[in-house]
C-alpha cells in the first residue's frame, strides 16, 4: 500500500511531464502504425505530392485541434463568451488572446511530434517529394533523361540501383529535417520555459505551494459539490413524493459561478491563489471580480486556470 501511495504521489507531482511524455509516445506509436499499415504511396506523378502531404499534415492538424478540445482553458475561455456584455468582452480581449497563445503552444506539441516522427521515418516525405515537379530537376541532376519520368515510381520500385540511390537521398533529407525540427522545438520550449520563469512574480517554492493549494482546493471543492448536490437532490425528491414545500438550500447563483469561472489574473497588490480564493476574499458581497488596474496574465501561472477548470468541470 505504501508503494502504491508513493507511485501515486509521484504521478501527481510530475503529472505534467508524464502527460507530455504519454502524448509524445502515443503520437509516435500512432504514426508508426499509420505509416506501415495505412500508408500506400500511389507512385503517380499526379497524386504523390498531394498524398504524401495529406498523410504528413492532416493528422497533425487533427491532433492540433484535438489539443484545443482537450484543454481545460479552451472551454473556460469559450463557455458563455457569446452571452457576455460588450464591455466585458472588450476588457478581457487581451487576456483572452494571451491565453489562446499559451493554449496553442501546448496544443502544438502532439502535431509537431507527429511531423518530426514522420520525417524521421521518411515514407511520407519520399512519396511527396517524388511527385514534385519543382524538385525533380534537382533530384535528377547528373542522371539520365529518363530519371524525371521514373521519379514518381521511386517509392514503389526499390529494386533498381538508381532508384535505391534516390530513395536513400530522400530519406536522408527527411531525417535531417526531422532532427532539425526536434532540435528547434526543444530549443523554443527551453527558451519559453526560461523566459516565463525569469519573469515569474513569485518564487520557486511559492509556485510549489501554489500547486499544492490548487490540488487541495480541487479535491475539497469536488467533495463539497458532490455533497451539496446530493443534499439538494434528496430534498427535491423528498418534497416531490411528500407533496410538500422543499426546505431552503442555499446554492451559489449563476453570477457566483461566472465569477469563479473567469480567467485568472495576477495582481501584486492583492494576491489570490485562484478565482475562488479571490471571490471569497472580496470586500463587498455585491462587488464584481472584473479586471482591475494591475491585473495581468502571467504565463508561468497558466496552471491556475487548468486546475480551476478541472474543479468546476468536476462539479
From Swiss-Prot:
It is a multi-pass membrane protein. Disulfide bonds join 41-127, 43-156, 140-147. GO terms for biological process: ATP export; regulation of natural killer cell cytokine production. InterPro entries: CALHM. GO terms for molecular function: monoatomic cation channel activity; voltage-gated channel activity. It is found in: Cell membrane. Keywords: Cell membrane, Disulfide bond, Ion channel, Ion transport, Membrane, Transmembrane, Transmembrane helix, Transport. It catalyses: ATP(in) = ATP(out). Pore-forming subunit of an ATP-permeable channel. In response to pathogen-derived and proinflammatory stimuli, relocates from intracellular compartments to NK-dendritic cell and NK-macrophage immune synapses where it mediates ATP efflux and NK cell activation involved in antimicrobial and antitumor responses. May assemble to form gap junction channel-like structures with gating and ion conductance likely regulated by membrane lipids and voltage rather than by extracellular calcium levels. Belongs to the CALHM family. This is Calcium homeostasis modulator protein 6. It comes from Rattus norvegicus.
